[in-house]
Amino acid sequence: VYDLKLSKFREGLPEDYISLSTNMDYIPYDDKNSEHVRIKKEIDDFMYKLFPEDDLRKYMWEHAASSLSGLNINQKFNIYTGGGANGKSKFVNLLSKALGTYADTLDIGVVTHKRSGPGRPMPEITKLPGKRYICMDESTKGDILNEGIIKQFTGGDKVEARGMYNSKMTQFTPQFEFVHTTNNLPEIKSRDHGTWRRIRQVPFKTKFVDANEVPANNIDPHSGNKVYMKDTTIDEKIDIWAPVFMALLIDIFKKTKGKVNDCDIVMEATNKYRYKQDILGNFICEMIENT
């Protein structure tokens, strides 16, 4: 067991009540170990290509490290956005591989439909206790987020649900970083601060293409974004990277204690997202002048 409070690796104790596992050994990062150095260099290159801007890359390292704590101190719902072939799923795969059974997925329908009636079974929710990283896949155009459920999962309050064919209710406090990967941003009808202070849109702007499609300067002439050759061995590399990646996240957590500092790129994307959702506000700003 790696004890985040004590910042040390120790023997597990019965009172830890641990039933989840990363499914790999903890190996501290050693900058004198040539294999560790080589793998770290590959991970750094991967992160640099995904997030060329220093501030955004720092945000994503802190975001990934915050998933270790289970404290949910940031109370955020991160939405990873961008067109296809931009590395969203590979980032999710790397973090999920490092976290083992602490990571899981959730159907987007859980947060786009109205809440189930009291006492109705919600087996999707009963698998979430103890999880540290929950990712929802693609939403479809026109999907509307139920902001009440988003607040419930990110607010630190207890959640109650019942499994299928089970009369007993499961009650727990969500401990996970809650994220959504999508090419189509879902609609958010709410305008209140309590909803939007939780939303963070993370743009994945880099594109990974076949070798014959890479521009000479690695810049897309239309978007101005970075373009790199896709790595067909990335899935095998992720399996190798995971232990070192976890060690790096623990080192970051020691410094941040799970706090994620906002960055201008994420906030700019989020504010544009919010602005587009406010149709009435857009009309007032564009069509009405003070006299």
Where are these regions (language model features)?
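Feature primarily recognizes SF3-like P-loop helicase cores of small DNA viruses
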Residues: 1-291
